[in-house]
A protein has these predicted regions:
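Conserved active-site and SAM-binding loop architecture
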Residues: 1-352
Length: 352
């Protein structure tokens, strides 16, 4: 399949094509982020990268099998507190127009356009008018441990040059929960918040700013005898014959604590009666009473939320990896959509 990918990011489109069992004959990608280009090129050396979509001549890709992409949703998302665009104008719309231009100039057999569900109705309607049909809404929670609701416009070229909608059924629910993808620790939720471009933290999570974290159960072991004490994760110190933990294991108050007499420190939080305290304020939480460190999700855990295969590598910093994953696609959702395109393509070949 000859692919033209706009706003390609970390090449989730290439990952999805592989997952759907579709051979990639040629893959041209438009992307300007140097870290995205470095990462996708590292994993897929065959990708040919180009620059800015605004300067592209998409007629050179005439005869492409598929155009895929999702213009940056930053300007349209409800998470955009300042200067959110709600009409079909502005920077966000200009970016979409480049995608629409790519369709018009390259005349692909199929296309997939993705964007955030939280865009305004006016923008959603304008996109649907441009394509000639309504999108399908799919929540990544069906195939992963992440709530991520996205709109997908999936089109097939007609004989008159326009496009008709390919009907996409909802994926089967795989029943994957957040606890299933954690490398360690526990969680108070069945599904993660929608992955964003930066790692979560305790403050944002507890204040419902929708960044995801995990909880690591710990035991604070204070010095006693030959035991130097310290924070003990996962395992308690040796249980003595009298049934005690050598008298020095305590559930601590939610303050900044660490090894007693040591310079190393960690934020420790106590959950008691369904509440956790952060900066003097209580928040309800569904965790067993106990003693926890709150940590951000690891890069590997975020990969699992986006159903990125374990072999995929990031030759960039974790900060950039989080950004790429947060801005990327849920691979298995795109692969699900591609299966329908694959079936339709086979029907077309059979008629020839």
């Amino acid at each position: 399949m000859k692919v033209l990918s706009l706003f390609d990011g970390m090449a989730c489109g290439a990952l999805a094509l592989q997952a759907a069992g579709i051979e990639i004959e040629k893959y041209d990608a438009y992307e300007i982020d140097k870290y995205a280009i470095k990462t996708s090129k590292y994993n897929f050396p065959f990708i040919k990268h180009h620059g800015d979509v605004f300067s592209a001549d998409f007629t050179t890709y005439a005869g492409a099998d598929i155009v895929c992409g999702g213009s940056p949703c930053t300007h349209w998302s409800i998470a955009q507190k300042n200067n959110r665009e709600t009409e079909a104008s502005g920077v966000g719309w200009d970016l979409f127009q480049q995608y629409a231009r790519a369709i018009k100039e390259s005349k692909p057999k199929y296309f997939i356009y993705e964007n955030n569900k939280s865009m305004s109705n006016a923008i959603r309607d304008s996109i649907s008018d441009a394509f000639g049909f309504e999108p399908v809404l799919i929540n990544s929670a069906l195939v992963s441990a992440q709530n991520r609701q996205r709109l997908y416009w999936v089109g097939k070229r007609k004989s008159d040059g326009g496009y008709s909608k390919i009907e996409i059924a909802q994926p089967c629910d795989k029943g994957i929960l957040l606890r299933d993808i954690l490398e360690s620790g526990v969680t108070d939720k069945e599904k993660a918040y929608c992955l964003k471009h930066q790692a979560g933290n305790a403050r944002d999570y507890l204040k419902k700013h929708h960044t995801q974290v995990a909880f690591e159960p710990v035991i604070l072991n204070v010095p006693h005898g030959f035991n130097k004490g310290g924070i003990k994760e996962h395992k308690t110190p040796t249980l003595t014959a009298n049934g005690a933990w050598q008298y020095n294991n305590y559930i601590c108050e939610p303050i900044r604590l660490g090894d007693v007499g040591s310079s190393s420190q960690a934020h420790i939080y106590e959950v008691q009666n369904g509440y956790i305290t952060h900066n003097g304020k209580e928040y309800p939480i569904k965790l067993a009473d106990g003693f926890y460190i709150i940590r951000k999700l690891t890069v590997k855990e975020c990969m699992r939320l986006q159903t990125v295969p374990e072999w995929y590598q990031f030759p960039v910093s974790d900060t950039q990896a989080y950004k790429l994953l947060g801005n990327g696609w849920t691979v298995d959702v795109i692969a699900h959509i591609l299966h329908y395109i694959k079936q339709d393509s086979r029907k077309g070949d059979a008629k020839k």
